[in-house]
């Protein structure tokens, strides 16, 4: 067993008290990215090692693996703690996104170790999509490279506002301050092309030797700033969703018996209270919240990120994929949008193609109308293209088969982010972030006759397996 963990449990007064203390710690999700062989996996291994998060059997296994696959001579190869795939160990690189978990007395952490190679851009984008902070590793011998710029751009494209530029392998440049200062200046010059609201910090370190990772380095007394771990423990993460209006995508209609009907999902943004008036999109029908049900019992109020079940005061038709928001909020469903796309399939994305798209719990179809440009992610220039290749990133104009309630991705990643699904293989082939909305093409409400409404209700009541939708919600049944 991890001896430091055992000591922490003893200090808290037992396992139950320790688990309660863990629940009240804040959580930081971050990723490590950079060029090939910059030391990303080694850095994560060093963080786990120096925060005493490695169990004794893991340490013993690491000694054996270092002898077989290690690249550090007689020293422990800490990268092997993270590089789990056989192909990764044989090549000495990271291919897949590897997730690791650790905690300190101040915070809990989820780490995503992402690949540095350009052909694995899609893996890196997947890792970045759920993170709050990015650690960009730079080899002190090489300085700012194209892949550094590429990963910086992808991180900011996916909404990450906190960047920590970790200038690694300072031991190989004799810990020179002028090397650190030059790379810092080069990166700041490049960062002028990135969004202006970023929090960028610089830390000189050596992941192999442990300098400035979890403890201050005696070899770089000229650096008076915090260690990398101190930055991670103290960075103030202000999530945009906390300040955004209430959005609740319905994931599941929970009806265990005739006396209960609730709508389950995760509150994407804002907050909701018992008694609050809400509106359902796309139907526009209003009601009020009767109960907020959670695993731990009913609550009076829920905040962004909480998994809840809402019970309403009125019996109205709500299905998976519908969006609940405050009754006084205005969000016009749109059929046309400009989407930043990260393409993940071998077959290029081209105008005229159609795909299934999934947004939160909503699934529909969309057609690619045009590709405005592809971004050269090595120098951030835009160029005209006829198609978007594997790992390509570009701005694409799309039309949806039905109006969707969308937000701009930078404001709300849940209701502004979507995935592309191949209809035949059901494989995810791309990720999209809403950049612009065009509400002019929204379909006007359709007026149905009383007979049509009665027939629709009859079909939904007696033939539920047809999965017919409520016409009042502008949803058309499908056999």
Swiss-Prot record:
PANTHER family: TRANSLATION FACTOR. This is Sulfate adenylyltransferase subunit 1. CDD domains: CysN_ATPS (cd04166), CysN_NodQ_II (cd03695), CysN_NoDQ_III (cd04095). Heterodimer composed of CysD, the smaller subunit, and CysN. Residues 25-239 form the tr-type G domain. Residues 34-41 are annotated as: G1. The gene is cysN. With CysD forms the ATP sulfurylase (ATPS) that catalyzes the adenylation of sulfate producing adenosine 5'-phosphosulfate (APS) and diphosphate, the first enzymatic step in sulfur assimilation pathway. APS synthesis involves the formation of a high-energy phosphoric-sulfuric acid anhydride bond driven by GTP hydrolysis by CysN coupled to ATP hydrolysis by CysD.
């Amino acid at each position: 067993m991890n001896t430091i963990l055992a000591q922490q449990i003893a200090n808290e007064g037992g396992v139950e008290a320790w688990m309660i203390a863990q629940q009240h710690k804040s959580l930081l999700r971050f990723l490590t990215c950079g060029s090939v062989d910059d030391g990303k996996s080694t850095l994560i291994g060093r963080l786990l090692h120096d925060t005493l998060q490695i169990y004794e059997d893991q340490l013993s296994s690491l000694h054996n693996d270092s002898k077989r696959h290690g690249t550090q001579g007689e020293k422990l190869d800490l990268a092997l703690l993270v590089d789990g795939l056989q192909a990764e160990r044989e090549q000495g690189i990271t291919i897949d996104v590897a997730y690791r978990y650790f905690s300190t007395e101040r915070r809990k952490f989820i780490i995503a170790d992402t690949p540095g190679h350009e052909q694995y851009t899609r893996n890196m984008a997947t890792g970045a999509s759920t993170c709050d902070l990015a650690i960009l590793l730079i080899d002190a011998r090489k300085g700012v490279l194209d892949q550094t710029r590429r990963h910086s751009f992808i991180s900011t494209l996916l909404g990450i506002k906190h960047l920590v530029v970790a200038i690694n392998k300072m031991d190989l440049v004799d810990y020179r301050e002028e090397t650190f200062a030059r790379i810092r200046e080069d990166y700041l010059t490049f960062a002028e092309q990135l969004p202006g609201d970023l929090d960028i910090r610089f830390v000189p370190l050596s992941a192999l030797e442990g300098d400035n990772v979890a403890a201050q380095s005696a070899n770089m007394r000229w650096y008076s700033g915090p260690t990398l771990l101190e930055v991670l423990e103290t960075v103030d993460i202000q999530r945009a969703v906390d300040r955004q209006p209430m959005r609740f995508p319905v994931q599941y209609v929970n009806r265990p018996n005739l006396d209960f009907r609730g709508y389950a999902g995760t509150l994407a943004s804002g907050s909701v209270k018992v008694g609050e008036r809400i509106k359902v999109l796309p139907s526009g029908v209003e009601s009020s919240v009767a109960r907020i049900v959670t695993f731990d019992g009913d609550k009076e109020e829920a905040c962004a990120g909480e998994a809840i079940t809402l019970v309403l005061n009125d019996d109205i038709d709500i299905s998976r994929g519908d969006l609940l928001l405050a009754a006084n909020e205005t969000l016009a469903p749109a059929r046309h949008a400009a989407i930043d796309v990260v393409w993940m399939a071998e077959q290029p994305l081209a105008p005229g193609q159609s795909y299934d798209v999934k947004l939160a719990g909503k699934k529909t179809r969309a057609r690619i109308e045009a590709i405005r440009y592809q971004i050269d992610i090595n120098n951030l220039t835009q160029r005209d293209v006829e198609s978007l290749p594997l790992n390509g990133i570009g701005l694409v104009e799309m039309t949806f088969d039905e109006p969707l309630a969308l937000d701009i991705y930078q404001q709300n990643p849940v209701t502004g982010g979507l995935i592309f699904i191949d209809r035949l293989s059901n494989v995810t082939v791309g990720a999209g972030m809403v950049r612009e909305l065009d509400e002019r093409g929204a379909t006007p409400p359709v007026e149905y006759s009383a007979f049509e409404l009665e027939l629709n209700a009859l079909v939904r009541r007696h033939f539920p397996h047809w999965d017919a939708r409520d016409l009042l919600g502008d949803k058309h049944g499908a056999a």
